[in-house]
Amino acid sequence: MDIKAFKMDGLGNDFVIIDNREKIINLTKDQIVKICDRNFIGCDQLIFIEPDSSADANLRFFNSDGGESGACGNGTRCVANLISNEKNNKSIILNTLSGKLKSEILEKKNCYNRNWESKVKMG
């Protein structure tokens, strides 16, 4: 099984982002904690990209202790940039436990370039 995953940084917060739009990945809390461990891959949060019929994607955020959180602005911006590149669209809607978040890519560059700008309307 191939897993599409990314390690990204947004204003000092780092994330492991897993594309789970095919819904084939189901990690346990212990597995999430292990991925977030700085002695393994390491990140502030693990983010799952999942399918959503009313938005470009649904995001699930997990903190390094394995607990799920509602949303994260920096993580949302990272995922929005990935999906923007994929869909060639500067305006992205992402569903989260905290509600729908709209992201606008301000300066569109290749998402693998470390320099890009976006904003997220959090509420």
Where are these regions (language model features)?
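Secondary-structure transition/turn motif
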Residues: 62-64, 120-123
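Short, solvent-exposed secondary-structure boundary/capping segments
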Residues: 111-122
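A glycine-rich beta-to-alpha transition motif near the start of alpha/beta enzyme domains, typified by
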Residues: 1-113
